């Protein structure tokens, strides 16, 4: 596990994250997979070793004291006395063998270097979205993965959400693509959580628009493709907090159907939302020539109200944190859990000679089939940096994406 923050451990700025992931996702899932005998040795690499005593104490409170029979042991890099070592992950990777698995949840601008190092060592790799920030990095990583014959995929749990899976399958029956609109937001507190990189090395579009850009590419990719991107941004609230970031970013993307007709997509993401009943508002509308689909992922018809937390809309379909009557973790059916489980099972099958990395193209969000997602996000950033100028996605005669052009 490379990265020690909110998604891995739920530990942010010395305490549990002020979000729906206070117990983390990655480490908890790996502890449970180890209980089942599906992973063995666990290592965790960060850049600040002095955080690890706090991380271990936090995990004991939110995992060890909550669930029965979970071993929380892991090896950490760098040492607990090392305040700063951004390359500690290299020493952790050197402890691994070809065929081992690496999960990366770090700031977006670090993904490519970490991924390249893992692939070079022959490890199978799952990287937080966006898998990388630049199209040329994505194509280089794809080539390296195929040369080393390893599995490289993007962690995109929405591909396991039963509502999104069903919508994707139905969208393919709705004829040519016409219009797509998505919105995803998180509260202003996330600006403090991600203060170290927000607006400096990445933005809210990379962080949140990645979800629905990938979903749309996954759903419509068999009959349409993105061809032009323009971006616009709203500013002011983040800057008032001393953070040099856009508040809200919207990508306007032209799509071309195989039939020659055109479609339009609008992806909007924001991290200046007020605190509300959910940590993330997230919804989309899709229109095809023969029908439409509307999904409100934030509201599943299940609400809770407590003295401690007030009114909230719950989504145990993502991660079920409440233990069962025997005190055991029973979140194995959550789509947040299953995206890691299926990657680990794939790595195990490849290691056992039962499958090859190419067998998972179309089954996982592999580096081979997420090129468009990276290209749209990269083009959006280029457009923003060019005062909203359009950026074209360039394809060769065989329909393969080869570059971007302002």
Describe each region flagged by the PLM:
Residues 5, 151-153, 158-246, 251, ...:
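Predominantly a Rossmann-like dinucleotide-binding segment in NAD(P)-dependent oxidoreductases
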Residues 40, 353-373:
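Glycine- and charged-residue-rich phosphate/anionic-cofactor binding loop of Rossmann-like
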Residues 207-309, 329-332, 336-355, 377-381, ...:
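Contiguous beta-strand/loop segments that form the cofactor/metal-binding neighborhood of enzyme cores
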């Amino acid at each position: 596990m490379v990265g020690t923050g909110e998604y891995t451990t739920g530990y942010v700025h010395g305490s549990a994250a002020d979000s729906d992931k206070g117990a983390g996702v990655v480490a908890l899932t790996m502890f449970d997979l180890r209980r089942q005998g599906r992973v063995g040795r666990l290592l965790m690499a960060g850049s600040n070793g002095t955080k690890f005593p706090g991380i271990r104490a936090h995990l004991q409170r939110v995992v060890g004291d909550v669930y029965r029979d979970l071993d929380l042991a892991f090896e950490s890099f760098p040492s607990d006395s090392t305040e700063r070592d951004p390359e500690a992950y290299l020493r952790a990777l050197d402890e691994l063998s070809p065929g081992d698995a690496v999960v990366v949840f770090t700031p977006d601008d670090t993904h490519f270097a970490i991924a390249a190092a893992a692939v070079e060592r022959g490890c199978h790799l799952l990287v937080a979205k966006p898998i990388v920030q630049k199209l040329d990095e994505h194509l280089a990583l794809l080539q390296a993965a195929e040369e080393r014959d390893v599995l490289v995929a993007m962690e995109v749990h929405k591909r396991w959400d039963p509502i999104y899976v069903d919508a994707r399958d139905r969208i393919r029956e709705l004829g040519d693509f016409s219009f797509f609109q998505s919105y995803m937001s998180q509260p202003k507190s996330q600006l403090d959580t991600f203060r170290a990189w927000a607006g400096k090395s990445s933005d809210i579009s990379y962080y949140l628009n990645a979800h629905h850009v990938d979903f749309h590419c996954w759903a419509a990719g068999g009959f349409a493709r993105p061809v032009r991107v323009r971006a616009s941004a709203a500013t002011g609230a983040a800057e008032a907090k001393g953070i040099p970031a856009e508040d809200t970013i919207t990508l306007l993307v032209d799509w071309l159907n195989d039939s020659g007709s055109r479609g339009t997509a609008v992806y909007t993401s924001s991290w200046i939302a007020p605190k509300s009943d959910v940590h993330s508002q997230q919804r989309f509308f899709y229109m095809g020539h023969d029908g439409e689909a509307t999904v409100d992922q934030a509201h599943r018809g299940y609400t809770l109200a407590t003295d401690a937390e007030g009114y909230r809309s719950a989504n145990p379909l993502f991660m079920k944190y409440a233990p069962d009557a025997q005190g055991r973790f029973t979140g194995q059916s959550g789509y947040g859990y299953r995206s890691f489980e299926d990657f680990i099972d794939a790595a195990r099958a490849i290691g056992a000679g039962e499958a090859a990395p190419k067998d998972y193209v179309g089954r996982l969000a592999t580096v081979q089939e997420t090129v468009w997602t990276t290209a749209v996000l990269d083009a959006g950033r280029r457009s923003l940096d060019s005062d909203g100028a359009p950026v074209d996605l360039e394809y060769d005669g065989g329909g393969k994406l080869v570059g971007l052009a302002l």
